[in-house]
Amino acid sequence: MKRQVALDTETTGKSDDGTPGDHRIIEIGCVEIIDRKITGRHLQVYLDPERPIDEEATKVHGYTWDMLKGKPKFADIAHDFIDFIRGSELLIHNAKFDTSFMDKEFSLMGLTEKTTDIATVTDTVSLARKLHPGHLVNLDNLCNIFGVSNKHRVQHGALLDAELLAEVYLAMTGG
């Protein structure tokens, strides 16, 4: 049995150098795939980032700090999240971005584990560039190339983007 998890995060923003800096995760979305079949099992959590959300980030995903105050903190859900992804192959579009945020959150909790200690990671941006050179490889364009409907995607959302990524990955790698 091969277990994969399409994963996406939404964040409060990013530093000028593209690293998390003092930014935090505000949403995690995961979609389980077993033996190339989307199982219907998923994980979605909204998180209180304990800090304001950059205006540019809000334009991308639509979330404000007021909407997320009172939601669980990352530490509150971390063990359930780790249990969900442990031992799987994570499919992440631009994996360096998401894993850097997850690793930062683990570190803030005092955990020494990195994402790659918990699961293997496949960067679907790199995979798309390898399999389909010359194409734009953002998620919307890949949806168009592979006939995955994304008409309901007005803004980014971690679970929605993970669902789209799961479908794109399966189409991109042979259906």
PLM regions with names:
Residues 170-175:
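Acidic two-metal-ion nuclease catalytic site recognized across multiple nuclease folds
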Residues 1-119, 129, 137-155:
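Conserved non-catalytic scaffold segment of RNase H-like nuclease domains
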Residues 160:
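Acidic donor-binding loop at a coil-to-helix junction in glycosyltransferase catalytic cores
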